[in-house]
Amino acid sequence: MELGSRDAFARMETLGIEEEFYIVDADGRPTSGIDDLVYGRDPPAEVPEGFDHELFKCTIEAQTELIEDPSNAVDALSTVRAALVDHAAADGYRIAAAGLHPAAKWRELEHAEKPRYQAQLDRIQYPQHRNTTAGLHVHVGVDDADKAVWIANRLRWHCPVLLALSANSPFWNGFDTGLASARAKIFENLPNTGIPSAFDDFDAFQRYERRMVERGSIADRGELWFDVRPHTGHGTVEVRAPDAQRDPGVTLAFVEYVHALVVDYAERYADGESPPTLRRELLDENKWRAIRHGHDASFITRDGEDTVSLGEAVADECDRLGIDGIRDVYDAESGSQRQRRLREEGGLDALCDDLMLSP
């Protein structure tokens, strides 16, 4: 039974970045490639721990090393991305990034044979069989377990903001869904997903985690797929809300934002601040607005008494936290808008070509 521990939470502000990508052929269409890229040969020297795969044979995950100093995030991310692109190219593959690949049709794609994923397919059935999603996960180290749970509770309001900024998955199974992030809607059809309820402290979270494993709801703690969670193995707060990104600058803007939020909330925790009561129903409404509208979303405020546009929220957050990256992301064309424009102007070929990472 794989469960984490309070002792894992020992260090503040370390970073880890996990990105899920699509393995594609020369035409940019998803294709099975994990037998070559994950199991077929040794990993590149730059990423000695190698790459992992996800549910489908056309998906692959790249993780940075533990980033001790947040100022090294740019180099760490560029190193692992370049290594993945080169590793794939050696076997004739390309790498593409989006929350959902617009050319992916799940009935035509192969599932991975790894026992963990086969067990999930058997347990969850249809929602997992069609789960061709790809996301971005950001870890920030926290040096106290109760603090980590307190911070995760507070980050719940920010998850829809991150999702709206990142939304770049309008196409699903060959058609336009009308959503900015169809990935988020597809993924939250799985159990133990979405924005979680608040937990009183680490003991409460660990009791829940243990109960879910002991009662057979999940195989291990890694199957709690919430938008934000204390990671009891790594000793981090993990934010899992964003769609995967082609542009590393966008990924790094989200990393900067999540890191700044964790540092800010850690200081508030130390000051003894009482967290506001956030109803999950209102958080779910905010997430729906992000899914549907992306950059055009507005959100119910924390007190439930007003709404704030994404642009206003971004401006407030940048001024409050002293960051700029998400302002640039908001000011630019959104990922979902870009995909729709490219498909209209150049068709599916142009869109698939645009999603591929540069060699």
From Swiss-Prot:
One family name in Pfam for this protein: GCS2
A Gene Ontology BP annotation from the UniProt entry: modified amino acid biosynthetic process
Superkingdom assignment: Archaea
Alphabetical list of Gene3D superfamilies matching this protein: 3.30.590.20
Swiss-Prot/TrEMBL keywords: ATP-binding, Ligase, Nucleotide-binding
Entry EC no(s): 6.3.2.2
Presence of keyword rRNA-binding: no
GO molecular function: ATP binding; glutamate-cysteine ligase activity
Reaction equation(s) it catalyzes: L-cysteine + L-glutamate + ATP = gamma-L-glutamyl-L-cysteine + ADP + phosphate + H(+)
InterPro entries: GCL_type2/YbdK_subfam, GCS2, Gln_synth/guanido_kin_cat_dom, YbdK
Family, as annotated: Belongs to the glutamate--cysteine ligase type 2 family. YbdK subfamily.
Role this protein plays: Catalyzes the synthesis of gamma-glutamylcysteine (gamma-GC), the main low-molecular-weight thiol compound instead of glutathione in halophilic archaea.
HAMAP family xrefs: Glu_cys_ligase_2
Name this polypeptide is given: Glutamate--cysteine ligase
Organism of this sequence: Halorubrum lacusprofundi (strain ATCC 49239 / DSM 5036 / JCM 8891 / ACAM 34)
